[in-house]
């Protein structure tokens, strides 16, 4: 009997150990499964973070491209506006004929000199005809200049103005106040509000 009891105790002990091993294996399996789930979750989160970062980068690149396109279009529009402004500027409209006017003014000077010479001729009739023709030519030229906005500067009898007059000499005079223009050697001209040439004048000064 004693021998039989001893033989039965062995299987009971082995069964307990086996049950404990199975429980341990089950626990380890559960732990591994949980770790696997956590690893999978972390991987999914990492992939999602990478995807979000890629989306953000793509969005930034698209935004940068939009800003660049806007900048280029704005720059092109500004350049077009600048060119139009250059073409249409009032400055150009007002002073575009300045070179032509400067070329015509010496012709008027020559006509004035011719008119002065005819006064001393011995043939009154010829002198009168020549004078009339020259005067008519002068009037026509002045009309052309006036059409383009050119006017003569008023000088004789005016107070000397360095903005419009250039004094070549000063002459003593009891009849005029000091700094009064009493003679004009060469006429001055304005193109609208711009000085083309000052008038060359003599001004009065009081006697010492």
Curated annotation (Swiss-Prot):
Swiss-Prot/TrEMBL GO biological process terms: protein folding
GO molecular function annotation: adenyl-nucleotide exchange factor activity; protein homodimerization activity; protein-folding chaperone binding; unfolded protein binding
Annotated Acidic residues bias: 45-64
Primary localization: cytoplasm
CDD domains tied to this protein: GrpE
InterPro entries: GrpE (IPR000740), GrpE_coiled_coil (IPR013805), GrpE_head (IPR009012)
Membership in a protein family: Belongs to the GrpE family.
Function: Participates actively in the response to hyperosmotic and heat shock by preventing the aggregation of stress-denatured proteins, in association with DnaK and GrpE. It is the nucleotide exchange factor for DnaK and may function as a thermosensor. Unfolded proteins bind initially to DnaJ; upon interaction with the DnaJ-bound protein, DnaK hydrolyzes its bound ATP, resulting in the formation of a stable complex. GrpE releases ADP from DnaK; ATP binding to DnaK triggers the release of the substrate protein, thus completing the reaction cycle.
Name of the protein this chain belongs to: Protein GrpE
Source species: Desulfatibacillum aliphaticivorans
């Amino acid at each position: 009997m004693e021998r039989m009891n001893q033989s039965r105790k062995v299987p009971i002990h082995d069964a307990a150990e086996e049950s404990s091993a199975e429980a341990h294996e089950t626990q380890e399996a559960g732990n591994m499964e949980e770790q696997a789930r956590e690893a999978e979750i972390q991987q999914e989160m990492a992939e999602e973070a990478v995807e979000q970062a890629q989306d953000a980068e793509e969005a930034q690149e698209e935004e940068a491209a939009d800003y660049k396109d806007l900048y280029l279009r704005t720059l092109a529009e500004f350049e077009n506006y600048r060119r139009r402004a250059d073409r249409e500027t009032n400055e150009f409209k007002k002073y575009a004929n300045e070179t032509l006017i400067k070329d015509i003014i010496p012709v008027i000077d020559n006509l004035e000199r011719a008119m002065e010479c005819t006064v001393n001729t011995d043939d009154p009739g010829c002198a009168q005809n020549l004078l009339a023709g020259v005067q008519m030519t002068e009037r026509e030229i002045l009309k052309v200049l006036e059409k383009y906005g050119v006017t003569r500067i008023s000088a004789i009898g005016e107070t000397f103005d360095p903005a419009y007059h250039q004094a070549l000499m000063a002459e003593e005079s009891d009849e005029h106040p000091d700094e009064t223009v009493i003679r004009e050697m060469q006429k001055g001209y304005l193109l609208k509000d711009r000085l083309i040439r000052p008038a060359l004048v003599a001004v009065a000064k009081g006697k010492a």
